């Protein structure tokens, strides 16, 4: 069960609606990148906003495949996306992208032990609401530009997204467990991020499994 845990005045919660061609959404070779591009741009927005105010990150901000934002091995936030039809617009659909971040939540008020807050992994930050607005501006500007490029040439931008995501993917190289919707699981090491945004997991027998849709958790050492 996945739920949002929000602390008023200490969290960043936003939903953004974007319009995307139906052809891209239906193209399984590129559509997996839409949510990940949103995550990549949110990471860039966080890092950029912290630097804008003279802050310092003590931990790298990374992305856990496919939709979580991590810092110091703990969850800082998450990104979700949902497709919604646009009435009387057959060639485009809306995608609602939701983001939740812990900005100034104290350690003792975090919802779970495996979560963290930006104030716990960075120093010299401004007021949480000032930082929130700066992150929002950077994210919207960056995402607007990336999605425009993606619509212009989705296959070119999929390559670009993979190149950007691979070095900041926290999941890669780690032992993980994938939970599928049918109740089955798969354990192994995440070894590659593929052209279509799927994840390759190598099991204990050396068999490679391509995972497109699953809840993938990193196993404790």
Language-model features: locations:
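Residue-level signal for pocket-adjacent positions within structured domains
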Residues: 64-65, 74, 105, 113-116, ...
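Short, acidic (Asp/Glu-rich) active-site segment that either coordinates a divalent metal cofactor
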Residues: 88-122
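Short, acidic Gly/Pro/Ser/Thr-rich loop/turn segments
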Residues: 21, 103-106, 198
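Contiguous, small/hydrophobic- and glycine-enriched helical/loop subdomains that border
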Residues: 1-93, 120, 124-141, 145-156
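A generic structural signal for short beta-strands and their flanking turns/coil linkers
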Residues: 10-12, 59, 95-99, 114, ...
């Amino acid at each position: 069960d996945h739920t949002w845990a929000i602390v008023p005045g200490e969290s960043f919660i936003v939903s953004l609606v974007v319009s995307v061609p139906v052809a891209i959404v239906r193209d399984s070779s590129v559509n997996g990148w839409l949510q990940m591009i949103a995550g990549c741009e949110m990471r860039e927005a966080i890092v950029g906003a912290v630097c804008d105010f003279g802050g310092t990150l003590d931990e790298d901000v990374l992305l856990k495949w496919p939709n979580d934002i991590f810092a110091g091995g703990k969850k800082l936030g998450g990104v979700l996306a949902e497709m919604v039809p646009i009435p009387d617009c057959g060639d485009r659909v809306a995608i609602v992208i939701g983001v939740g971040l812990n900005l100034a939540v104290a350690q003792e008020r975090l919802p779970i032990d495996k979560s963290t807050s930006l104030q716990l992994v960075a120093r010299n930050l401004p007021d949480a609401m000032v930082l929130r607005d700066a992150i929002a501006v950077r994210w919207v500007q960056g995402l607007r530009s990336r999605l425009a490029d993606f619509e212009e040439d989705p296959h070119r931008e999929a390559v670009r997204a993979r190149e950007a995501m691979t070095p900041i993917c926290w999941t890669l190289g780690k032992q993980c467990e994938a939970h599928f919707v049918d109740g089955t699981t798969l354990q192994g090491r995440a070894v590659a991020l593929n052209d279509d945004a799927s994840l390759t997991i190598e099991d204990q027998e050396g068999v490679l499994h391509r995972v497109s849709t699953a809840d993938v958790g990193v196993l404790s050492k």
